Amino acid sequence: MSDQSSEPLDSSLRQAVVPDSAAGRRFDAVLAELFPEFSRSRLSEWIKSGDALLDGETARPRDTLRGGETVQVQVVLETQTHAAPQDIPLNVLYEDDHVLVIDKPAGLVVHPGAGNPDGTLVNALLFRDPNLAAVPRAGVVHRLDKDTSGVMVVARTLQAQTALVEQLSARDVHRQYLAVVVGALVSGGTADAPIDRHPRDRLKMAVRDDGRDAVTHYRLRERFRAHTALECRLETGRTHQIRVHMAHLKSPIVGDPLYGGALKLPKGATDTLVAELRGFKRQALHAETLEFLHPVSGEPIRASAPVPEDLQRLMSALREDSARAAELARR
């Protein structure tokens, strides 16, 4: 807006001067630019509750400014989560005062809920940084399924949370996944199919004409005899998106308990591959890279999470099985 910025008067009161360039504009719009660390909805609530004052007086969101007014905001940061902090180890890939980037292991639930009241990522985050209790969802701005591993970004401040949510909404956050699917695909492509809740099974999502738009781009990373390793890039971020799209394409993700169907063993598979496929009890899906703009500096950040051991073993077994089949075919 200009070089005018808000300044803390104490732990809960912020003040700023409306620049002359804002003359003729609405109070709520200018307030959002003066205090970008807070969401528009939160600022609107504070205007209505009288916690955002214009020259010491209450004002309406639509009131027109003339420039030069003093704005004061009484920050009311109620606790956003009542989850208990728990000392759960986190694999941190990047950290500063505004964001935390982690490599989430498979098996770790993100949010507490029915069946998982604790032992979640949120519990771990609150132990690492108690201030996250005042940030919506303890700073979690996107999620990974329990049994999907890989990179996630967490906002440590309201300003970071607001900026990252805006980037996600604008589809400016780039996410790439490694997926091992059933079937030897011959080419990559794009799955452009809307997704919504399954009409009968409430635990599942499904491709539906009346669903929300969902787009997944995928390309071949490595072909095996009866499976394929794909690099999947999300354009949207629907629940179970890659899992649903791959199942819709008749190439479900290996080990997927919801969408994978019955276990399929390639004819003549090596004993090692049979053991790996039978023992792989989660979807073979890993969030490998995440790219976003730093919510404060605007600098691009690219974080990568290494392929976990279970997926490495699975791909190694698939590779060996394919090599053995090729050798037998040459005889």
UniProtKB/Swiss-Prot annotation:
<dbReference type="InterPro" id="IPR006225">
    <property type="entry name" value="PsdUridine_synth_RluC/D"/>
</dbReference>
<feature type="active site">
    <location>
        <position position="145"/>
    </location>
</feature>
<keyword id="KW-0413">Isomerase</keyword>
<dbReference type="GO" id="GO:0000455">
    <property type="term" value="P:enzyme-directed rRNA pseudouridine synthesis"/>
</dbReference>
<dbReference type="GO" id="GO:0160140">
    <property type="term" value="F:23S rRNA pseudouridine(1911/1915/1917) synthase activity"/>
</dbReference>
<dbReference type="Pfam" id="PF00849">
    <property type="entry name" value="PseudoU_synth_2"/>
</dbReference>
<dbReference type="InterPro" id="IPR006145">
    <property type="entry name" value="PsdUridine_synth_RsuA/RluA"/>
</dbReference>
<keyword id="KW-0963">Cytoplasm</keyword>
<comment type="function">
    <text>Responsible for synthesis of pseudouridine from uracil at positions 1911, 1915 and 1917 in 23S ribosomal RNA.</text>
</comment>
<comment type="similarity">
    <text>Belongs to the pseudouridine synthase RluA family.</text>
</comment>
<dbReference type="InterPro" id="IPR036986">
    <property type="entry name" value="S4_RNA-bd_sf"/>
</dbReference>
<feature type="domain" description="S4 RNA-binding">
    <location>
        <begin position="25"/>
        <end position="97"/>
    </location>
</feature>
<keyword id="KW-0698">rRNA processing</keyword>
<dbReference type="GO" id="GO:0003723">
    <property type="term" value="F:RNA binding"/>
</dbReference>
<protein>
    <recommendedName>
        <fullName>Ribosomal large subunit pseudouridine synthase D</fullName>
        <ecNumber>5.4.99.23</ecNumber>
    </recommendedName>
</protein>
<dbReference type="GO" id="GO:0009982">
    <property type="term" value="F:pseudouridine synthase activity"/>
</dbReference>
<keyword id="KW-0694">RNA-binding</keyword>
<dbReference type="InterPro" id="IPR006224">
    <property type="entry name" value="PsdUridine_synth_RluA-like_CS"/>
</dbReference>
<dbReference type="InterPro" id="IPR050188">
    <property type="entry name" value="RluA_PseudoU_synthase"/>
</dbReference>
<dbReference type="GO" id="GO:0005737">
    <property type="term" value="C:cytoplasm"/>
</dbReference>
<dbReference type="InterPro" id="IPR020103">
    <property type="entry name" value="PsdUridine_synth_cat_dom_sf"/>
</dbReference>
